[in-house]
From Swiss-Prot:
Its EC number is 3.1.3.-. One of its GO terms (biological process) is bacterial-type flagellum-dependent swarming motility. Gene3D superfamilies: Metal-dependent hydrolases (3.20.20.140). Belongs to the PHP family. It comes from Klebsiella pneumoniae (strain 342). Zn(2+) 3 binds at E73, H101, H131. It comes from the Bacteria. GO terms for cellular component: cytosol. This is Probable phosphatase KPK_3500.
Length: 245
């Protein structure tokens, strides 16, 4: 089990079913030390208002030894790599994920998807790309992995892609893991939980990584400190409350 989970949704995204408190309780039960709440960006139909994201400042950083990161799963909106996270949202959040979602960016062709994803990474706003192995959004995998390494953006291996969403992602995700390995980049594991019961569940991710002999030293979830060092290297201010995580 990894002690960090970087992708989950609360009832603020109304197709999800758990609260912040639910996730804290489950993290304590499972031994998760650090997690990020990453509700959908405002351009999704059932996403929270941007006030939800800027008001995360009222959350405690640490509850009963569990660290909480303030995040978003933003939407890549166009071929220029624009995301629905800007202004005060950018400065209020610790972790900015970006990905393709059909209601915001209808599937197009491989070159368009690749150009848009690389542009989002090149913007400097994004720390992590969500479910890049989605077969509905094919990309040039070597080009994406090389760009992610160049811009220091993690590519996600998303556990729910192998269970309940994005059917047919396995081959793409194995290829992505191998390409990230060869490019010297980072992978991030996300449960993509829409209920707290699946927090920290990475069983299927582990199978993908094992299949390509992915190096443990390039997985951000191995420890809170590794993840925090990565975010700090990307400009996130150090968070004193997390010093002992």
């Amino acid at each position: 089990m990894y002690p960090v989970d970087l992708h989950m949704h609360t009832v603020a995204s109304t197709h999800a079913y758990s609260t912040l408190h639910d996730y804290i309780a489950e993290a304590k039960r499972k031994g998760i030390k650090l997690f990020a709440i990453t509700d959908h960006g405002p351009d999704m139909a059932d996403a929270p208002h941007y006030w939800h994201f800027v008001n995360m400042r009222i959350w405690p950083r640490l509850v009963d030894g569990v660290g909480i990161l303030r995040g978003i799963e933003s939407n890549i909106k166009n071929i220029e790599g624009e995301i629905d996270c800007s202004g005060p949202m950018l400065t209020s959040l610790d972790l900015i994920i970006a990905g393709f979602h059909e209601p915001v960016f209808p599937p197009q062709d491989r070159d368009t998807h690749t150009q848009a994803m690389i542009a989002a990474m090149a913007s400097g706003k994004v720390h992590m790309i969500s479910h890049p192995g989605n077969p509905k959004f094919p990309v040039d995998i070597p080009a994406i992995a090389e760009a992610a390494a160049r811009y220091q953006v993690a590519l996600e291996i998303n556990n729910s892609s192998f269970i309940s969403s994005r059917v047919g992602s396995e081959d793409n995700c194995r290829a992505i893991a191998a390409a990230v390995r060869d490019a010297g980049g980072w992978v991030a594991l996300g449960s993509d939980s829409h209920t707290a019961f699946t927090l920290g569940e990475f069983t299927e991710c582990r199978k993908i990584l094992d299949a390509v002999d992915f190096p443990e030293e390039r997985i951000l979830n191995v420890s809170p400190r590794r993840l925090l060092n990565f975010l700090e290297s990307r400009g996130m201010p150090a968070i004193p409350e997390f010093a002992d995580l």
